[in-house]
Amino acid sequence: MAQADIALIGLAVMGQNLILNMNDHGFVVCAFNRTVSKVDDFLANEAKGTKVVGAQSLKEMVSKLKKPRRIILLVKAGQAVDDFIEKLVPLLDTGDIIIDGGNSEYRDTTRRCRDLKAKGILFVGSGVSGGEEGARYGPSLMPGGNKEAWPHIKTIFQGIAAKVGTGEPCCDWVGDEGAGHFVKMVHNGIEYGDMQLICEAYHLMKDVLGMAQDEMAQAFEDWNKTELDSFLIEITANILKFQDTDGKHLLPKIRDSAGQKGTGKWTAISALEYGVPVTLIGEAVFARCLSSLKDERIQASKKLKGPQKFQFDGDKKSFLEDIRKALYASKIISYAQGFMLLRQAATEFGWTLNYGGIALMWRGGCIIRSVFLGKIKDAFDRNPELQNLLLDDFFKSAVENCQDSWRRAVSTGVQAGIPMPCFTTALSFYDGYRHEMLPASLIQAQRDYFGAHTYELLAKPGQFIHTNWTGHGGTVSSSSYNA
C-alpha cells in the first residue's frame, strides 16, 4: 500500500541523515540501497523506532510511494545516476519526480531534465550543502530543473532545510534545468576561496608575526565576533586549539598537501569557458595543486632562495588588524566574482536567478554560511539588477575601509616571501576593475601586428581596423572579428 511521502536511494551517511531529518519533520520515507542488506541494517539501527520504511527492490519502493511519486537519488555523481534513472523510468508514471541530490555536473542535469521531460518524468537537480551534520539537522538546498516539480517537493525541502533569521528556510527554487547544480558548483568554488584566504591569513600570522597556536586561535575567535563571523572562521579557531593525545597541537603535524574532489576546478573551468574573471577561485584551486607537490617542494626549499630572514618590526596588534581587513576585502572580491559567474550563466542559459535568494540559501546550513551573506542579500534587495557587488554602496565602503590594511598585508607578505595567491589576485582584480584604462590596447596592437586580428579605436568603437605595422603587410577591410 502506498504510504511513503518520498523515497531516498543511497544509504551512505548523507543519505541516512537526510532520511532521519525528513522523518523528524513528519514525512514518511522509504529507504533503498543497491546493496539491499544496508536497508535492513539501517532500519534495525539508525532508523529504529522511526516511521522510515524499507524496500528490497526498486519495484517495491515505487509501490510504497504516494502519487506523484518523489524519489531522491543520493548516489555517486555520473554513471550511477544514469543507471538508476534508466531502471526507474519503466516503473514510473507521467508526473512522477526524480531528484538528484548528488554533486552532479550541471550539464548532466540539463541533459537528464530534457531526456526525462520527453518521457513525462519531472527531473530536479538539487545542490545539497552542509555535510553530514547539515543533512541531519538542516542543510542548504538548491533545487533546479523542471519547475512543475516544485509545488510537490517544496514543503519537504523547505521543511528540512536550515532556517535563519525569523525562520526563513535556506532553500528556494533556483531555476531551470542545471541551475541548481550550477549554483551548488559556484558555492563549492567560493568555499575553496574562503578556505584558501583563511590559510593565507594563518600563514601571515604564523610566519610574519610568529604567533603561537593558541594565540592564533584566539585571534580567529575574536574575528568571529566581527564581519567575518562564519562557520569556517569558527572551526579554524577550534582546529588551532586542538591538541593530540600527546598534549601537543595537532595542526603542525598534518601533512601540508590539500586534497580536492574537483568541484572547485569545475567552477574555474566554467569561468574560463564563459570569460568571467573568477581569479580568486582559480588561484585557490591552483594553491591546492601546488600543495600536492610536497616532495618537489621539499627539494626546491633546499635550492631556491627567497628574501633574507625577514624580521617584522612593526606593531603586531596593528598588523593583525591589517590581516583581518585583507581577509575581509578579499572575501568580498571572491563573492563578487562568484556572483559575476552566476549572472553570466543566467545570460548564457536563459535562467532567471534570484541572487538575493541564493545568498539567503547559503546563509545557513552550508559550509560557507556566514553573517556576510545577509549583506549580499541586502545588496540585491536594494538593487535586483546590481551588476557587481563592488558597486553596492555597502560593499564599496567596506572595501575602501579595508584598502590601506589590505595593501600593507599584501606588500609585507611579499617582502617576507609568503605565498598569498588569493590575497594578491583579489587586490589585482580590484585594481583592474577600478581602472578605466588597462594596457590591453597593447595586446590588441600585438595581435594585429602578428596575426592581423584588427583593433578598435577609442574614438570609433565598432569599427575594426588593421594597420600595416612593418610596411610589408596587407590591409583588412572586413569588419568581422573572430579571434
From Swiss-Prot:
SUPFAM superfamilies linked to this entry: 6-phosphogluconate dehydrogenase C-terminal domain-like, NAD(P)-binding Rossmann-fold domains
Gene3D superfamilies tied to this protein: 6-Phosphogluconate Dehydrogenase, domain 3, N-(1-d-carboxylethyl)-l-norvaline Dehydrogenase, domain 2, NAD(P)-binding Rossmann-like Domain
Gene Ontology annotations for the cellular component aspect, listed alphabetically: cytosol; extracellular exosome; nucleus
Reaction(s) this enzyme catalyzes, per UniProt: 6-phospho-D-gluconate + NADP(+) = D-ribulose 5-phosphate + CO2 + NADPH
One Gene Ontology molecular-function label: carboxylic acid binding
Alphabetic keyword roster: Acetylation, Cytoplasm, Gluconate utilization, NADP, Oxidoreductase, Pentose shunt, Phosphoprotein
Active site: 184, 191
Predominant cellular place of this UniProt entry's protein: cytoplasm
PANTHER family: 6-PHOSPHOGLUCONATE DEHYDROGENASE (PTHR11811)
The protein's name in its UniProt record: 6-phosphogluconate dehydrogenase, decarboxylating
Lineage: Eukaryota, Metazoa, Chordata, Craniata, Vertebrata
Gene expressing this chain: PGD
